Amino acid sequence: SPALDDERNDNFIRL
């Protein structure tokens, strides 16, 4: 899961 630490996917995994 590259989206876990990807700042570009901020609206995806970050709470």
UniProtKB/Swiss-Prot annotation:
Principal location: secreted
Keywords: Neuropeptide, Secreted
Cell compartment(s), UniProt: Secreted
Any single biological process term in GO: neuropeptide signaling pathway
GO cellular component: extracellular region
Protein family membership: Belongs to the FARP (FMRF amide related peptide) family.
The protein's role, per its UniProt record: FMRFamides and FMRFamide-like peptides are neuropeptides.
Full protein name: Extended FMRFamide-12
Source organism: Karoophasma botterkloofense
Record lineage: Eukaryota, Metazoa, Ecdysozoa, Arthropoda, Hexapoda
